[in-house]
Amino acid sequence: MPRRREVPKREILPDPKFGNVELSKFMNVIMEGGKKAVAERIIYGALDLIQKKHPDKDPLEAFVVAINNVKPMVEVKSRRVGGANYQVPVEVRPVRRLALSMRWLKEAARKRGEKSMAQRLANELLEATEGRGGAMKRRDEVHRMAEANKAFSHFRF
């Protein structure tokens, strides 16, 4: 742990189209090599595809629901006690919760088979709103690990 002062959180401006801060953060997660325009095109393209597939659904609302569904409540951390490593379940802080859900959505979309990244992302977001998809599978896996190691929860950090 650093002993210096705590680093202040940078204020992230909301995205230009929807005025949503979470969407802006997700844009930064999707961005690679500083190419923000490409990330913006991918995300807005995915939201447009969601709008076309489900005209009754608000694409921004679908995005928020998907992010909230993928957020993990608990995760496991390794803790060494008496020469043995234990996987200790710990509650996830809200900031990390959001970061993990965005990262998992990105990774799950990458692994999909559709042609463009916008299509992959749109389908992954739609599946996440319904509680399916690669990102949801990842969250459930993390929750299962925490549940299986509940016996070691007294080794709190």
Curated annotation (Swiss-Prot):
Please list the GO biological process terms of this entry: translation
Q: Which InterPro entries match?
A: Ribosomal_uS7, Ribosomal_uS7_bac/org-type, Ribosomal_uS7_CS, Ribosomal_uS7_dom, Ribosomal_uS7_dom_sf
A GO CC annotation recorded here is: small ribosomal subunit
* Taxonomy, superkingdom: Bacteria
Q: PROSITE patterns from the entry? A: RIBOSOMAL_S7 (PS00052)
Signal sequence residues = none
List the CDD domains: uS7_Bacteria
Q: What's one Pfam family here?
A: Ribosomal_S7
Q: Which UniProt keywords apply?
A: Ribonucleoprotein, Ribosomal protein, RNA-binding, rRNA-binding, tRNA-binding
| Annotated GO MF terms | rRNA binding; structural constituent of ribosome; tRNA binding
In the record, the note on similarity to other proteins reads: Belongs to the universal ribosomal protein uS7 family.
Assembly and interactions?
Answer: Part of the 30S ribosomal subunit. Contacts proteins S9 and S11.
The record describes the protein's role as: One of the primary rRNA binding proteins, it binds directly to 16S rRNA where it nucleates assembly of the head domain of the 30S subunit. Is located at the subunit interface close to the decoding center, probably blocks exit of the E-site tRNA.
What protein name is recorded for this chain? Small ribosomal subunit protein uS7
Q: Which taxonomic lineage is given here?
A: Bacteria, Pseudomonadati, Pseudomonadota, Betaproteobacteria, Burkholderiales
